[in-house]
């Protein structure tokens, strides 16, 4: 445990340097493997090393397993909680030797259904059904959680799940120098106040929250979360029954260790507090995050600064994250469910006052449209919605869809402290609540759980996503679920998707690009 600010900064810098070296080494190994021996060499790498940025051999030349034509991959319903299978299982699966997905590793019992897209009939197979175009295939996979198909890799988009083969993601394996792979990792609410911070201090280990997830998270090219907690050496720590969240700079060590690059502070605990920490508390937090090498966005000392996105570049692909506070700075829906009406004292930044980037739709949409013209990937990360419910409010749906109409690549949301589902709108995903990642709400199953979102891009195109369910142990330590626990979470996630469709004006035509 560091005893002085200088020791603290030295330790954080050591963590940051070590992480950067690990990422650099991984990318170099992947590049060498792809150039030297193609996909076979990639398959020989450790799993965490096969996770970016891919082989330069091109989609048409990739041969993943016996039974798969060159340039093709297996895709399933996104509802199937199965990331991949072994190469030796591919041909038997296509030929109907497996009747149930649990036979190839799925954590549940679900009949296998082969759907064939016209022109792509695997040799020696007997499909359950045939569809005429890709849109019909997407519909078939959405309607049947056990359905799968063989597809050319270049046809695949984020509306289907692409199976890894022997730990190799076909989308990444087929990436090229002109269309490189980029993996983004998105976490939900991270809060080190109250019991979470107390547990760190009890153990005397400020990296402990991330020990069970750090290796996987550090494998991503970019990792971002919502961070809502004051970080200060001058503010007194709040008691466990307090709704003000305060921690010390040492608490950031775990985020650095796990590879967090940036965090949105556009939320209801960046400026507002019952004790009145206000702008000085926000400044402390921003300072300590920046010192740790984690860039805060969605806040600033005036409105212009609060509207500035966090921008990064990976393999030549530019990415902009844009934070918006729809809870304590909601100027367009001040009286709606899930909004703290701040009256004459909002947290919103203005031309002359610091604060969070407010939810003011004409301003937000103009910003998104401008960012779309400048960057390849644009991801608004909202803090909004009613807490502890399964489905989004209608105003949240309206806000999210307008952002997609403005050109956003996807929409991310935190704040409800319970997982909600997602929807595909105009071919792009909206994630209505990613849920808790580090928070001391042990009182319900929903608040103890969340997910880590994996997004795989090829160039600027989102080709796939996966949700990795997490549960929170002992008030402060996330771990990834597995087996039946993961299957149960997956079931609740998709039930929320279906309930949202029934209650929020869903139509299948709205899903089309």
Which role fits each region the language model picked out?
Residues 1-28, 35-42, 47-50:
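N-terminal secretory signal peptides
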Residues 23, 44-69:
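C-terminal segment of N-terminal export signals and the immediately downstream linker at the start
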Residues 62-177:
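Flexible loop/hinge segments at secondary-structure junctions
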Residues 197-211, 245-246, 313-378, 484:
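Binuclear metal-dependent hydrolase catalytic cores centered on His/Asp/Glu-rich metal-binding motifs
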Residues 198, 446-513:
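A short C-terminal boundary segment appended to hydrolase-like catalytic domains
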Residues 220-232, 263-270, 368-391:
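Short acidic, glycine-rich surface-loop motifs adjacent to enzyme active sites
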Residues 235-256, 376-407:
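Active-site-proximal segments of metal-dependent phosphoesterases and phosphodiesterases across multiple
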Residues 259-262, 392-451:
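Conserved beta-sheet core of the metallophosphoesterase superfamily
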């Amino acid at each position: 445990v560091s005893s002085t600010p200088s020791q603290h900064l030295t330790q954080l810098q050591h963590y940051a340097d070590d992480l950067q070296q690990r990422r650099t080494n991984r990318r170099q190994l992947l590049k060498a493997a792809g150039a030297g021996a193609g996909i076979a060499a990639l398959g020989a790498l450790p799993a965490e090393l096969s996770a970016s940025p891919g082989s330069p051999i091109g989609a048409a030349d990739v041969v993943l397993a016996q039974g798969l034509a060159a340039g093709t991959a297996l895709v399933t319903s996104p509802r199937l909680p199965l990331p991949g299978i072994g190469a030796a299982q591919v041909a038997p699966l296509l030929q109907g030797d497996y009747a149930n997905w649990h036979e190839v590793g799925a954590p549940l019992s679900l009949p296998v259904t082969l759907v064939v897209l016209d022109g792509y009939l695997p040799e020696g197979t007997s499909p359950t059904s045939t569809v005429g175009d890709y849109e019909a295939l997407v519909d078939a996979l959405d309607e049947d959680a056990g359905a799968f198909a063989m597809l050319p890799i270049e046809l695949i988009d984020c509306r289907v799940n692409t199976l890894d083969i022997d730990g190799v993601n076909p989308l990444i394996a087929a990436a090229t120098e002109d269309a490189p792979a980029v993996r983004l990792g998105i976490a939900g609410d991270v809060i080190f106040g109250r019991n979470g911070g107390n547990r760190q201090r009890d153990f005397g280990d400020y990296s402990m929250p991330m020990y069970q997830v750090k290796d996987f998270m550090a494998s991503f090219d970019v990792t971002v979360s919502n961070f809502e907690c004051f970080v200060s050496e001058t503010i007194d720590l709040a008691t466990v029954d307090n709704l003000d969240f305060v921690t010390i700079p040492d608490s950031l060590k775990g985020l650095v260790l796990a590879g967090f690059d940036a965090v949105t502070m556009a939320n209801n605990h960046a400026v507002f507090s019952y004790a009145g920490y206000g702008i000085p508390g926000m400044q402390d937090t921003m300072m300590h995050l920046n010192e740790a090498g984690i860039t805060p966005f969605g806040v600033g000392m005036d409105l212009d600064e609060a509207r500035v996105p966090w921008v990064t570049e990976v393999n030549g692909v530019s990415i902009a994250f844009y934070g918006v506070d729809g809870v304590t700075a909601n100027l367009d829906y001040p009286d709606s469910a899930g909004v703290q009406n701040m009256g004459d004292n909002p947290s919103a930044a203005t031309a002359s006052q610091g604060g969070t980037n407010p939810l003011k739709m004409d301003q937000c949409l103009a910003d998104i449209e401008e960012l779309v013209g400048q960057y390849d990937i644009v991801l608004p990360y909202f803090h909004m919605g009613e807490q502890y419910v399964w489905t989004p409010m209608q105003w949240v749906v309206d806000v999210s869809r307008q952002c997609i109409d403005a050109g956003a690549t996807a929409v991310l949301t935190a704040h409800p402290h319970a997982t909600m589902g997602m929807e595909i709108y105009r071919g792009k995903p909206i994630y209505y609540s990613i849920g808790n990642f580090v928070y001391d709400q042990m009182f319900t199953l929903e608040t103890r759980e969340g997910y880590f979102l994996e997004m795989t891009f090829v160039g600027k195109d989102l080709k796939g996503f996966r949700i990795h369910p997490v549960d929170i142990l002992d008030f402060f330590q996330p771990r990834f679920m597995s087996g039946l626990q993961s299957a149960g979470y997956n079931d609740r996630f998709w039930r929320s998707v279906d309930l949202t469709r029934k209650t929020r004006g869903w139509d299948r035509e709205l899903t089309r690009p």
